Each structure stands twice: as C-alpha cells, then as structure tokens.
Amino acid sequence: MTTLTSTPRQDGYYMPAEWAPHSQTWMVWPQRPDNWRDNAAPAQAAFAAVAKAIARFEPVTVCASAEQYLAARAALDDPRIRVVEMSSDDAWVRDTGPTFVIDDNGGLRGVDWTFNAWGGKDGGLYADWQRDDEVARKILEIEYCDRYRTEGFVLEGGSIHVDGEGTLITTEECLLNRNRNPQLSREQIEAVLREHLAVDSIIWLPHGLFNDETDGHVDNFCCFVRPGEVLLAWTDDANDPNYARCQAAMAVLQRARDAKGRALIVHKIPIPGPLHASDAECAGVVALDGSQLRDPSIRLAGSYVNFLIVNGGIIAPAFGDPLDGEAERILREVFPEHDVVMVPGREILLGGGNIHCITQQQPAPFVR
C-alpha cells in the first residue's frame, strides 16, 4: 500500500454509486459493553444475521478483535464470510472504513478520512478512537489498495451518498457541525469532497433524522436509489419532531438539480415508531465515562433508509413495527430488480445505527 499525495480526482478516480457491482462487503464485529447491551451478545447475533443475508449475494469480510476472533468465526459459519483479526474501538465500518474509489481502467483505491468518533471532545460518542481511525488503513493494506489520507479533515462515510454520476447528497447538520471541521467553510468542505470523490454537484439537506447521535447522517434519512431518484424518510404527523426536517428536506430536493441537470424524483418511506429502548435494554449497557448515555426516554433514530444495496439485493432493517410491511413494499417497488431481504435491526439501532452504518461496500474494479 502506498499513501498518495495526489487526490482521486487528479488521478481519474471517483466514488461509484452503491448499486455498482461489488467485490465484497466489509463489517466489524461488535464487542464494547458500554455501547452494546449484555456484553454485545444480542448485537453479535444481529450482526451475524446481517452478514449471512449479505453473503447470499456477495462475499463478506468481518474484522474481529483477537479476543472475539474465535467467537466471531463460530457465529459466522458461512463459506462466503471471511473473518480477519483486527483491533478497533467499535463496529461502525461505514464511518471508520475506507471510501473506495475506482477509475475506468480497473483501478481500485481508498480514501481514508480522519475519524473523531462523531465529534471528538465536543460531543464525540466515546474516547479514545485511535484504533478506529486506523481501520481504513488496515483494510486498504489487506486489499493492497493505495490510499488517500485526508489528515485533519474529518468525515464519516455515513454522512454522504453519491449517485456515481457526479452528484453527492449530505446534511448541513453533520458536515457543517463545529465538531467536525470548524476551521473550514462550506466552500472549503465542498472542495475536499469534489477532489476526493470526483463529484460536481452537492445537495445540502438542512438536517438528518431527529435525535440521530451522529449529528444527522444522511444515510439514515435520504439516499439515491438510481440516478435522478432519491428515497426520503417521511412522516405526515405534524407533531412528530421529524416533520419539519422532512418538509425542509423535501423543499431542497424539489428545487435541486443533479450534476446532469435532472430534477429529482423523490420517493417517500415512512419513519417507524416512535421507537425507544426499554429499561431492561438500557440496563444491559455498562456505563463508562466518555460513552454515550442510554436512556429509555430518548427516542431512537430508527429508519428504513438505513439499508445496504448489494449485488442483486437490498438488505434492510425491520423493527417489529407495524410499518415494517409497508417499508418492505416500498423497497420492492423502488428496487424491482433486487431481492429485498428484511433483517431484524432493533439490536443494531440500540447501539446507535443500522445496517448501512455497519457495512462498507468494496466496488468491483472494471475496465470501461
């Protein structure tokens, strides 16, 4: 692995859309007791179910600590799931792993963003996060991929979505938050995104979902489903704190034009719940200094948008909610050529995210 001093755009590389063919998906095995209840056993079962669902469509590599390696290997009993030993601080590989970029000549490289646990000393969710900031480099070394390191520029993979044709969508709530890159203006942040993802048009939604502890990651709220079309989490309940957020996002999306000059088609998918952790679920989390508080009174940021597109499939969360069926129907309508697989997502949600947050796709290189 070589750490390059150029940028992907200078070298002809770009971030492809999630629906482009994958060579595999990456995950990290959960274990920290101050985030995952009951010593992470329920979360590990949930992660294993997600990995096995993905493995129906493409290979999966799961990174597990030395302490957890044998347990992970036993739980992930599928020939298409590889387990590698890797230290980390937590299991959110969407945010700690590399953003892979490709060119039109069979090349594959990775962008290694600086990671600060969603806010560092100003609202970050745990300390220390040094091992998580090294996950992207370790994955790139395993894959013999050259690396672009954005030293000092903080970004998580869950805060961006691209259409593969030059358009990126994100939220002001996250990328303009003072706990990410306070030294940079919006224009300077856009310049980094344009250079490292080779995008030309950036759509800024004001907010993500209410109470999203990542400061409003877009991957829990709105995503591209194909060029010119997005899927937006939605509520018609004016008393829901997400109502104003949905309305504001819709106003932006209706005015927006993508990099090809297209107006966007916006599909809506309902927001489940309101969902809350139970007293018992919160009691199973070990309270440690510097970690995120788990409280039954705090609404969970549940979302059906937090799914992963894989080769021929959609791996989406179900919550045991009355809206699960409607969400599955909408996903089947929006992705008619994909097999929609709903996987229990509550345990992942209790830790602060969902299926898209715990996965990172590795695109398959190709020659145009």
Swiss-Prot record:
NCBIfam families per UniProt: agmatine_aguA, PRK13551.1
Keywords: Hydrolase, Polyamine biosynthesis
Functional note: Mediates the hydrolysis of agmatine into N-carbamoylputrescine in the arginine decarboxylase (ADC) pathway of putrescine biosynthesis, a basic polyamine.
UniProt catalytic activity: agmatine + H2O = N-carbamoylputrescine + NH4(+)
InterPro entries for the chain: Agmatine_deiminase, Peptidyl-Arg-deiminase_porph
Protein name: Agmatine deiminase
Family statement: Belongs to the agmatine deiminase family.
Disulfide bonds: none
Active site location: C357
MF-aspect GO terms: agmatine deiminase activity; protein-arginine deiminase activity
Associated pathway: Amine and polyamine biosynthesis; putrescine biosynthesis via agmatine pathway; N-carbamoylputrescine from agmatine: step 1/1
Domain of life from the UniProt record: Bacteria
Record-linked Gene3D superfamilies: L-arginine/glycine Amidinotransferase, Chain A
Alphabetical GO biological process terms: putrescine biosynthetic process from arginine
EC number from the UniProt entry: 3.5.3.12
rRNA-binding keyword on record: no
Assembly mode: Homodimer.
